[in-house]
């Protein structure tokens, strides 16, 4: 089964079986086919994939790099560029990225810059990658610990979403991706929340429910990206929860899974929206909390304590350090004007005069972060 799910801003297909030669019909066999993944994915699923692509008469060049956000660095990027040169990869070759969000970020940046751009295909293998990272063409690497500081907008020619790849993951990694779906419900489509309430228990057991879940989330993000492909206004709402998330990921030195950081970030940014008077209904905060807990997602900084190395606790649980890290967010116009997305109602981010992010009062931001850190220090 190959279902054409989305054609704009780029093609996305829902695929029942990756081992289908029709998927590769648009890729020439005249040039090498580069496959980029991380070492974990390479170990778990790559050998049969390489064998299959070889059987289609392609010259396959598999490349991999160490897994995890810690390795999404300039050094890794340059190493991979050098490997492409060492393999004499010519202009006209195609690159396929297979993996989670870190792999898709890296392969997009690699493909967009090698020979000023070579054709790119994406095969997401995690929930986060399937409903978020594979859509919209953003890519990038971290620099000096700052999230995605270098990157480009570079659309893939096609994305192949094969839910069967999720079966290779522990269930906790499925849950990391749920936070991005909850985000879509917060900012754009409240029916995502309703879907999770009604069918959440069946996501792991029903192929039909899982496929529908992936479709709905892809459609939400693709619709937003299509209206603002270069992140000038509306697309910024996809950063809901991510302003706080990126700051605490930086302070964790790459030890904090992105989905868990986003879950906590959404709760904190919802509190800021409420205290700032942008969100009028306090019941939404409780609803967000209950939905997150249903999927065993953290909602406070305190719940992250076991994931943060002990020697980083003092720095991590300091509101001033978090605010300092927030100052480096890419949305900011200056370090003193920290911009973030505010939730106005379920399924609606506030437009803030068409900018879709605003600067909360520093006193509100500090007090909420202080409360979060104080709760940890007193337990």
From Swiss-Prot:
Claim: Zinc is one of the keywords in the record: yes
Cofactor(s) this protein requires: NAD(+); Co(2+); Zn(2+)
Catalytic function, reaction form: 7-phospho-2-dehydro-3-deoxy-D-arabino-heptonate = 3-dehydroquinate + phosphate
Enzyme Commission (EC) number: 4.2.3.4
Upper taxonomic lineage: Bacteria, Pseudomonadati, Chlamydiota, Chlamydiia, Chlamydiales
Binding site for Zn(2+): 180, 242, 258
Compartment(s) where it occurs, according to its Swiss-Prot or TrEMBL record: Cytoplasm
Entry function: Catalyzes the conversion of 3-deoxy-D-arabino-heptulosonate 7-phosphate (DAHP) to dehydroquinate (DHQ).
GO MF annotations in UniProt: 3-dehydroquinate synthase activity; metal ion binding; nucleotide binding
Family to which the UniProt record says this protein belongs: Belongs to the sugar phosphate cyclases superfamily. Dehydroquinate synthase family.
Protein name (database record): 3-dehydroquinate synthase
Free-text comment on the cofactor: Binds 1 divalent metal cation per subunit. Can use either Co(2+) or Zn(2+).
Any Gene Ontology biological process: amino acid biosynthetic process
Residues engaged in binding NAD(+): 67-72, 101-105, 125-126, 138, 147
Pathway: Metabolic intermediate biosynthesis; chorismate biosynthesis; chorismate from D-erythrose 4-phosphate and phosphoenolpyruvate: step 2/7
GO terms under cellular component: cytoplasm
Keywords in alphabetical order: Amino-acid biosynthesis, Aromatic amino acid biosynthesis, Cobalt, Cytoplasm, Lyase, Metal-binding, NAD, Nucleotide-binding, Zinc
InterPro entries, per the entry: Dehydroquinate_synthase (IPR050071), DHQ_synth_AroB (IPR016037), DHQ_synth_fam (IPR030963), DHQS/DOIS_N (IPR030960), DHQS_C (IPR056179)
PANTHER family linked: 3-DEHYDROQUINATE SYNTHASE, 3-DEHYDROQUINATE SYNTHASE, CHLOROPLASTIC
């Amino acid at each position: 089964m190959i279902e054409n799910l989305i054609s704009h801003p780029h093609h996305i297909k829902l695929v029942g079986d990756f081992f289908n030669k029709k998927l590769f019909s648009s890729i020439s066999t005249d040039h090498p086919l580069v496959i980029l993944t991380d070492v974990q994915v390479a170990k778990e699923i790559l050998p049969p994939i390489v064998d299959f692509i070889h059987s289609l008469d392609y010259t396959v060049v598999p490349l991999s790099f160490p897994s995890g956000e810690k390795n999404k660095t300039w050094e890794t990027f340059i190493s991979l560029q050098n490997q492409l040169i060492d393999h004499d990869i010519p202009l006209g070759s195609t690159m396929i990225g297979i993996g989670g969000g870190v792999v898709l970020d890296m392969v997009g940046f690699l493909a967009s810059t090698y020979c000023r751009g070579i054709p790119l295909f994406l095969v997401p293998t995690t929930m986060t990658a399937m409903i978020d990272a594979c859509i919209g063409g953003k890519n990038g690497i971290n620099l000096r610990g700052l999230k995605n500081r270098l990157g480009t907008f570079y659309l893939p020619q096609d994305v192949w979403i094969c839910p069967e790849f999720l079966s290779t993951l522990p269930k906790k990694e499925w849950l990391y991706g749920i936070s991005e779906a909850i985000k879509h419900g917060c900012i754009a489509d409240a029916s995502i929340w309703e879907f999770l309430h009604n069918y959440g228990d069946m996501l792991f057991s029903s192929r039909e429910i899982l496929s529908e879940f992936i479709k709905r989330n892809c459609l939400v993000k693709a619709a937003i990206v299509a209206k603002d492909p270069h992140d000038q206004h509306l697309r910024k709402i996809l950063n809901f929860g991510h302003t706080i998330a990126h700051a605490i990921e930086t302070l964790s030195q790459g030890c904090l899974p992105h989905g868990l950081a986003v879950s906590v970030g959404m709760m904190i940014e919802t509190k800021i929206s409420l205290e700032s008077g942008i969100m009028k209904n306090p019941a939404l905060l409780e609803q967000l909390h209950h939905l997150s807990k249903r999927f065993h997602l953290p909602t406070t900084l305190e719940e992250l304590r076991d994931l943060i190395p002990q020697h980083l606790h003092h720095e991590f649980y300091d509101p001033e350090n978090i605010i300092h890290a927030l100052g480096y967010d890419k949305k900011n116009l200056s370090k003193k004007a920290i911009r973030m997305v505010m939730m106005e109602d379920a399924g609606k981010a506030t437009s803030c005069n068409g900018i879709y992010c605003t600067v909360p009062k520093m006193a509100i931001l500090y007090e909420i972060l202080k409360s979060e850190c104080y709760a940890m220090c007193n337990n």
